[in-house]
């Protein structure tokens, strides 16, 4: 009995122990269940907090980004404004430069126009002054020389008569049968100088002889050219006289009748001389004859002395 009781007691004790253990387990489970719910709640809360924190962080990041963007855009806007201002200033400067250039161009044009006007005015004034001075020359200004006395007039008549008479005798009595001439119209003009104004530089032996020879040479060249080129006679006449004057200038033998000597050679219809024969007869021979007559006749006069110079 005792063993059976002991076994029953042990079974009961075991049952009690198991019950206690079960109760304890239930208690533990009951305790752990709330803990799990709390943990889940806490986890949820933590997750929510994390989400909130993330959201806050995101918001902060967004805010910071927006602030950064604003900070970035603000300098960019300011830079753009500065660039725009600089561009405007540059445009204004360019406009000012263009205006200045236009003003300078206008000023230059005005200056050029003024210069042209002034030049025209100066040209007109110079032309006016030139013609004023030109027509003033027509007035002369010097007194005319006094008339020669009767003695001088008498000797001029006598010497010129003798000089032309000698040439006429040679022309009509000596050379006419040989179809040559000895008397030219230009010798009459030479007679006026060497017999009427023997003191004139144009009447001296160099001028008388060399002037006629140079002019005859020019006239002969022009006449030969006229024959072979069929040039205009009018031009040939003008060239003969003008070139004869140039030749006399170069040889210091200006003698006004020399121009007539050159002209006669070109205008003569009947050419009684061939080639350059005209230079020797009648020009050189006639001028030397007149020189000899002047030397003889002029020096008979009391107040005359001929020549003043020879060469």
Curated annotation (Swiss-Prot):
Biased composition (Low complexity): 37-67, 76-111
InterPro entries: HPP
Residue spans of biased composition, Polar residues class: 9-18
Chief site of localization: membrane
Coiled coil: 95-124
Membrane topology: Multi-pass membrane protein
Keywords: Coiled coil, Glycoprotein, Membrane, Transmembrane, Transmembrane helix
Protein origin, superkingdom: Eukaryota
Subcellular location, record wording: Membrane
Region annotated Disordered, chain positions: 1-113
GO cellular component: membrane
Glycan attachment points: 8, 35, 38, 62, 76
Membrane-spanning intervals of the chain: 150-170, 181-201, 208-228, 235-255, 276-296
The keyword Transmembrane is annotated on this UniProt entry: yes
Designated name of the protein: Transmembrane protein DDB_G0273707/DDB_G0273361
Organism: Dictyostelium discoideum
